[in-house]
């Protein structure tokens, strides 16, 4: 007898509920990655935030 696998049912049900959160999390991650990848060492040297947090 084949055992019932609950994971496909669980993921299908949870995807309907959680897709807005997961999509927003992915978009936010992509934006943060793109913005931080564009920073240079010169930008860091001139940044007040970096200067305050550098020890």
UniProtKB/Swiss-Prot annotation:
Broad class of where this protein is predominantly found: mitochondrion
Name of this chain's protein: ATP synthase small subunit 6-A, mitochondrial
Gene Ontology CC: one annotated term: mitochondrial inner membrane
Membrane topology classification: Single-pass membrane protein
Family indicated by similarity: Belongs to the ATPase 6 subunit family.
Protein purpose: Mitochondrial membrane ATP synthase (F(1)F(0) ATP synthase or Complex V) produces ATP from ADP in the presence of a proton gradient across the membrane which is generated by electron transport complexes of the respiratory chain. F-type ATPases consist of two structural domains, F(1) - containing the extramembraneous catalytic core and F(0) - containing the membrane proton channel, linked together by a central stalk and a peripheral stalk. During catalysis, ATP synthesis in the catalytic domain of F(1) is coupled via a rotary mechanism of the central stalk subunits to proton translocation.
Transit peptide, UniProt annotation: 1-11
Domain of life from the UniProt record: Eukaryota
Annotated localization: Mitochondrion inner membrane
Keywords tagged on the record: CF(0), Hydrogen ion transport, Ion transport, Membrane, Mitochondrion, Mitochondrion inner membrane, Stress response, Transit peptide, Transmembrane, Transmembrane helix, Transport
Induction annotation: Induced by several abiotic stresses such as salt, mannitol, drought and cold. Under oxidative stress caused by H(2)O(2), transient induction followed by strongly reduced levels. Induced by sucrose.
Cross-referenced PANTHER family: TRANSMEMBRANE PROTEIN
Organism per entry: Arabidopsis thaliana
Annotated TM spans: 21-39
Biological process per Gene Ontology, one example term: response to salt
Gene behind the chain: ATP6
